Amino acid sequence: MKNMEYLGCEIMKLIESIPTCNLLEINLNKCILEISLNRVDVFNALNPEIIQELINIFSWAANNSAATANSLVSDSGEILPRIIILKGNGKHFCAGADINWMKDSGECTLEENQKDAKRLDELFYGIWSNPCFTVGLIKGVALGGGAGLVACLDHVIAMDGSKIAMSEIKLGILPAVIGPYVYKRLGSAQFRRLAMLGSRINTDEALRIGFIDEIAKDENDLSINCEKIISQILTSAPSAIEQAKFLCKTFDDWNENMKELRDYTLKTTSIMRGGKEGQEGLGAFIERRDPDWKIKDEE
């Protein structure tokens, strides 16, 4: 930091480093990054351009998050992102893949279609594995790839009347790229059923099977519920949130014996206890004060 200033280098402000987006609306407010899909005329359908913009912004958030930096602020003193809110402008969250793009894929080579599929998976994995806590605000429909976006998020609040569907089978294709993420969220039986039915489920059904986490009665309630979950997550240590995601992935991927898994959890617990956040959290508890990552309401 000091060396760069001595050499006359200008350090770019955090907000100035955000990737340029034409099909997304981006708002960074302190530690909260809000991303709004903004193809309202086509119900926020996914095409290659918006997919790439989503990849870029989620990658930027991962690289500049408080968890990645292991600090609440950057070297220049700017507050780093801890929470990402994903929503859609207009009446609908996301109607899935742009039908014209899908139709054009029939004229593409296998290699070109695989490249598109790989890019879509890069998006889903970038959301699912993001070190920030991700919140989805859903209204209208979340179909196909839109349902995939929902499945990748950590906490999903849907407005009453919203519909979710893995509708690919109605078009003679499969929910294969979104599959791993929906499968992890729903489990085998529900994924299998919905993948074959392809029909839309309402918010009550989505809540029952775990596709969403909360139902909001209207847009005002959607905002209120979002504020509540933000308040809760800001009492959690940011790097520990990232490690919780990694721990879950380790459990999902584990193919070894139970003894090795137990050894892994013991090692992880020991590392976290002795780490910066662990020491701050334990110290705060003993001293009966808030840990340094907790943001008070007035802030």
Residue ranges of each PLM-predicted region?
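Short helix- or helix-capping micro-motifs
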Residues: G96-A97, Q190-S199
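Glycine-rich beta-to-alpha active-site loop
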Residues: F124-L171, R200-I201
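Hydrophobic, secondary-structure "cap" segments at the distal end of domains
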Residues: G179-A189
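C-terminal long alpha-helix characteristic of the crotonase
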Residues: I157-S162, I212-D263, K276, W293-E299
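Glycine- (often His-adjacent) and acidic-residue-rich active-site loop
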Residues: N63, V73-P81, K87-L123, A142
